[in-house]
């Protein structure tokens, strides 16, 4: 997720 500030929360 390049445009996501909290990328470590979008790891599924």
Swiss-Prot record:
Major subcellular site: secreted
Phenylalanine amide PTM sites in chain numbering: 12
GO CC term (a single one): extracellular region
Keyword set, alphabetical order: Amidation, Neuropeptide, Secreted
Any one of the GO BP annotations: neuropeptide signaling pathway
Location(s) in or outside the cell: Secreted
Source domain of life: Eukaryota
Protein family according to the UniProt entry: Belongs to the FARP (FMRFamide related peptide) family.
Protein name: CalliMIRFamide-1
Organism: Calliphora vomitoria (Blue bottle fly)
Lineage: Eukaryota, Metazoa, Ecdysozoa, Arthropoda, Hexapoda
């Amino acid at each position: 997720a390049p445009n996501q500030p909290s990328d470590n929360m979008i790891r599924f």
